[in-house]
Structure formats: C-alpha cells, structure tokens
Regions:
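Short beta-strand edge/turn micro-motifs at domain boundaries
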Residues: 2-15, 108-110, 153-186, 190-192
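A structural signal for the main folded, soluble domain(s) of proteins
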Residues: 35, 102-104, 186, 200
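A solvent-exposed, acidic/Ser-Thr-rich amphipathic alpha-helical stretch
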Residues: 51-136
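Short, low-complexity N-terminal intrinsically disordered segments enriched in polar/charged residues
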Residues: 2-44, 48, 56
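A hydrophobic membrane-anchoring alpha-helix module
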Residues: 174-179, 186-217
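Short, hydrophobic/aromatic alpha-helical segments in well-folded domains
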Residues: 38-41, 53, 57, 96, ...
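Transmembrane beta-barrel outer-membrane domains
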Residues: 33, 89-91, 149-151
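Short, P/G- and charge-enriched loop/turn segments at secondary-structure junctions
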Residues: 84-87, 141-148
Length: 217
C-alpha cells in the first residue's frame, strides 16, 4: 500500500482490494497484527498499573489527549497510573472493533473501548471521583459508604508510526460517549464469589508468572 493510497481524498476504513504481491500482502497482515497488539497492550498496561509497559505503547515524542490529560504520552503514564491507584480499587479495559489503515511506516486506527472501575466508598473517595452531586445522592439513599462502579465507553483514535521496526502510538485522542455510575453489585461473599480468582495491579498478578522458562510446570 503506497503513500499515494493514503491521499487526502481517500475514505478511511473503506473496503480494499488486496495489494499486489505476496510479500506486500504478508507485510500488511503482519503490520496490522502488530498494531492491534499495541492497542491491546495499552489495556494490559493500564489495568496492571504498569508504568513502564504503558510507556512502551507510545513513542517518546507521542501525545495523548485523554480528557483529564493532554500532553506528552510518557508523562501521561506517570500521571495516570498513580491516579488510578489512588482513586480506584480495580479496573478493566477492553479494546475491540479495531479498524486499521497502514501506509508504509504510518498507520491510522480507530478502536472501541469499554472500561470498568471500582471506587472505594466514603464521602472523600466518592466525591473526588464522581463529584459532590453524586455523593449527595448516595448519602441520601444510604449508599455513600458502599463501593461504587464506574463504567464508560468510547473510542481510541490513533496515529501510529513504525520506527526501527517497532510500531508505537504517535498521536492518541479519545472519545468518551457514555458512562454509568452505581453502587457496586459485585457478589463478594458466598455463592460464586468463593471461586473468584482476583487479579492484581502489580507484578504479583498471575500474568507476570507466565514464562517459557517454566513452560512445562
């Protein structure tokens, strides 16, 4: 796919015919897979609160316009991870519906995101995350001290660049198109909860134990 194919009048994400030549086709498939893995790696990094992994998603000169933050993406990682640790007890991000256009060492991607967060109860915690109006409603209905849930959905709009053979995000902008807030409905004792295997937001998470060195264990 040539630079000319990415001209200004080209409609992004429209159906395409296959490129000429098997090598070009394989390169396109490989590049797209690497880009999708970058998008998924972001979700892993943010949910494990792994600052260095989160930085690895972005080039050093990348920017992220992320609602409460708009600036250098490595600074975003330093800003967001401590904030998540301070304000939430758990989080899960899902990235889906990835549409990717590749032109040489540049790419454009749109993907959908869904996020879930649990917020500790109490006036200070609930007011800080949700605002005083929501906290007042919770106080009125007796749920202020309960754990709360915040669910949100939107899209990631990305420009990616391949440098030294590695794809990373160069420009990111997000949209947040809906949210839902409520006291937590999570089952915490009895029933199926006894079989829950919780994750962790640090290297004690079971995913960090995955290794080819212990593959046969």
């Amino acid at each position: 796919m040539s630079e000319q194919d990415m001209s200004a009048d080209r409609v992004l994400f429209a159906p395409r015919t296959a490129p000429d030549g098997q090598d070009e086709l394989l390169r396109l498939v490989y590049d797209r897979q690497q880009i999708v893995e970058v998008l998924h790696r972001y979700a892993r990094a943010i949910d494990r609160c792994d600052i260095e992994l989160l930085k690895s998603v972005y080039h050093e000169d990348a920017t992220d316009a992320h609602g409460s933050f708009d600036g250098n993406a490595h600074e975003f990682a330093e800003f967001m991870v401590p904030r998540l640790r301070a304000q939430t007890s758990y989080g899960v991000h899902h990235v889906t519906n990835e549409l990717v256009e590749v032109a040489g060492d540049r790419a454009i991607a749109e993907s959908y995101m869904w996020g879930y967060h649990r917020i500790p109860g109490g006036r200070e915690s609930v007011s800080r995350f949700f605002g005083p109006a929501y906290a007042a409603r919770c106080e009125a209905d007796g749920t202020l001290d309960a754990e709360h849930e915040y669910m949100t959905g939107g899209r990631y709009l990305d420009k990616l660049v391949k440098r030294s053979g590695i794809w990373r995000i160069w420009r990111r902008r997000i949209t947040v198109e809906w949210n839902q807030c409520q006291p937590s409905r999570m089952l915490t004792d009895g029933g199926r909860s006894q079989y829950d295997i919780p994750g962790a937001r640090d290297p004690t998470d079971q995913s960090y134990r995955l290794s080819f060195d212990s593959f046969d264990e």
